[in-house]
């Protein structure tokens, strides 16, 4: 996986409780100046969803947004990234944080439960690993980090696969979403089409 998106990190070593963090990506453009108002609106909507998800398991008043709408450069494109953090309630752990936040809000949309129902109704194939989470957890050290499984290849029956897509909002256009999907896929296609490794 070459995912640039953090789904959930967990750090219980701070001495200030168990800190969880999520950095959803919403908004993709070919230049740093190319973001549309819909990209910003979509990012803020998902930040609110993630704040709500974390608020279910974090101490009251601890959920914060230390970074909103940061522009990150990645090979061939730019993303809007925000970060949401919180301190888990006493007695809550890593599994509680995952239960409260999975699947990642950036790939479901909001409201999450209704959006998941629409996805189930409209998508003809299960997503599998795509849009899930990949990472590591060290229970002994009380740390972990999971990404959102975008920009991720998987092999099925001798075929190399990857998924890509875009979020549909009230002011999306089919042409704009298709262009965003192609932009996200461009480097993956280039990598998959390169010389085979022995």
Q: Where in this protein do the model-derived segments appear?
A:
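Extended alpha-helical targeting/anchoring segments
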Residues: 1-198
């Amino acid at each position: 996986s070459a995912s640039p998106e953090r789904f959930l990190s967990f750090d219980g070593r701070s001495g200030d409780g168990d800190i969880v963090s999520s950095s959803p990506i919403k908004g993709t453009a070919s230049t740093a100046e190319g973001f549309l108002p819909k990209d910003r609106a979509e990012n803020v909507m998902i930040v609110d969803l993630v704040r709500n998800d974390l608020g279910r398991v974090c101490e009251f008043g601890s959920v914060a947004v230390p970074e909103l709408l940061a522009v990150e450069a990645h090979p061939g494109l730019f993303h809007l990234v925000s970060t949401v953090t919180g301190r888990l309630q006493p007695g809550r752990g890593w599994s509680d944080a995952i239960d409260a936040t999975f699947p990642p809000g950036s790939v479901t949309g909001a409201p999450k439960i209704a959006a998941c129902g629409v996805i189930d109704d409209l998508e003809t194939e299960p997503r599998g690993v795509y849009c899930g989470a990949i990472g590591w957890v060290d229970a002994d050290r009380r740390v972990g980090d999971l990404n959102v499984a975008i920009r991720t290849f998987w092999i099925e029956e001798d075929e190399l696969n990857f998924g890509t897509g875009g979020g549909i909002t009230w002011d999306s256009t089919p042409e704009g979403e298709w262009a965003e999907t192609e932009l996200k896929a461009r480097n993956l296609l280039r990598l998959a089409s390169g010389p085979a490794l022995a």
